[in-house]
Amino acid sequence: MQEAVVLMRDELKESCYVEGVQYLPLEECLPRTDVILTIGGDGTILHEANFTLQYQKPILGINIGRCGFLATCEVDEMEEKLAALVRGEYLLDNRMLLYVRVLGEDGWEGHALNDVVVTKGRLQQAIDFSIYCDDILVEHYRGDGVIVATPTGSTAYSLAAGGPILDSQTKGIVVTPICPHSLTSPAMVFAQERKINICVGQVIDNEVFLSCDGAAEYPLSAGSTAEIRLSDQIVQLVTFSRADQFQAIDQKLRSRR
């Protein structure tokens, strides 16, 4: 790639006009795009990864958020790294996705780059959850919820709940309880080929919700089952070093101590 043409959604023309940029409807932009640039934090990357999934375009995150763990370009690096992007001097980091569907008549489904979370509503009592791996009961939790995370998501909510950090190239799924009412309820790591089912137990005057990457919540009821497995799609993140994840851990997580 020796030269670049910048495309932007036409609805941004008034608020973000830049001379030389082509403003087109979104459905025309994406098929012509080589790389999607996001400007924001991790939430922006997660949103765009799901929103543009069908186009399978690499994403480069430019961080102006608080952490920007998934972004590999800081504002003060833009000139250098965008020039490298135009020259084709970058790498593509393939990240696995989770596919989730709620079993039942409506069959709600979604994808997650970071995590699938089943949790109780605010100020509600603890809820019982049963975890099945390939239809075999492996754990029963009573607590505030359960996080099912990818290696990408292992440094996000799952980590804050006590889960392990996985190398982004590890082929695994992390299941982490949220505030379990037990001294012996550790996070568990499963092979990516496994099918994970989360079954909601008895619910008394409680609200239970499922969300993918922190997006809109889907309500669950007693007896509901969410089936989670490896998606047949991936997300490609633009990176400039194979060590970017470990550099981010050192610079953006340890630096907070």
Q: Predicted regions span which residues?
A:
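ATP/NTP phosphate-donor binding region
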Residues: 1-35, 39, 47, 75-91, ...
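Gly/Ser-rich helix-loop-strand patches that form or flank binding pockets
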Residues: 47, 51-62
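Residues in the short beta-alpha loop(s) of Rossmann-like NAD(P)-binding domains
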Residues: 10-12, 179, 232
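Short hydrophobic core segments
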Residues: 36, 116, 146-150
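Catalytic core of DAGKc-family lipid kinases
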Residues: 67-144
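Gly/Ser/Thr-rich active-site loops/lids in small-molecule metabolic enzymes
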Residues: 140-143, 148-184
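Short glycine/serine/threonine-rich phosphate/pyrophosphate-binding segments
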Residues: 43-48, 155-159
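ATP/nucleoside-binding phosphotransfer catalytic cores, i.e., glycine-rich phosphate-binding loops
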Residues: 105, 118, 134-137, 185-257
